[in-house]
Amino acid sequence: FALNPWFLDIDNLIEENFIFISNPEELGPTKQNKSHFDFDDADNLTKKLGHLLLQCWSSQVEERKLAFNEWISKNSWIEDYALFVVIKGEFNMLPWWEWPREFKIKNKKFLKSWIKEKSDKILIEKLIQWHLDEQWRAIKKFANKYNVKLIGDLPFYVSRDSADVWSNKSLFSILKNGDLIFQSGVPPDYFSSKGQLWGTPTYFWSKHKSTNFD
């Protein structure tokens, strides 16, 4: 469900007064004239935007806060996603199966006080995803207006190191410690004489069926 924070439209955030910047250089230097994408630049910029969104959030009009809260209530996935991103950042982006045990198994009792302690960071991730969703919907509306069709691509399986797998282990062929029971791939074919091993957990369809594929 989540979108990549690198797609945030900074101009839109400024125009709509979600962030206040008197000088674009406040966001820091970015490397120009490069023939490749600079991931470090993108990460640093996203972090700065997140902090700006948080700083300006308390001064936003009540209507916007209500819209945000309504979006949160309709997108339950955001709770686990935001928590996952913040925990991952705390442990130097290690995969979740290398986190300390209580984080790895998602011990709710243990995490309760930790979530309160990191509430600002968690709010930042929620705000980023809310803005991304709003901006995406605006693009989709614009495309519809001019009869432009958008095509998306979905993977067969879910990444092992993802919020979805970490928070819903029982739905995948994976143990609580992160070890794979079964993993996806394809046998040898025209494209690969040795076949392919993708490293993503397969689905426990019986578990999905019991939840009505919710």
Spans of features found by a protein language model:
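Alpha-amylase-like alpha-glycosidases and glucanotransferases acting on alpha-linked glucans and related
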Residues: 1-133, 158-214
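Conserved, well-ordered alpha-helix/loop/beta-strand core segments that scaffold catalytic motifs
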Residues: 125-158
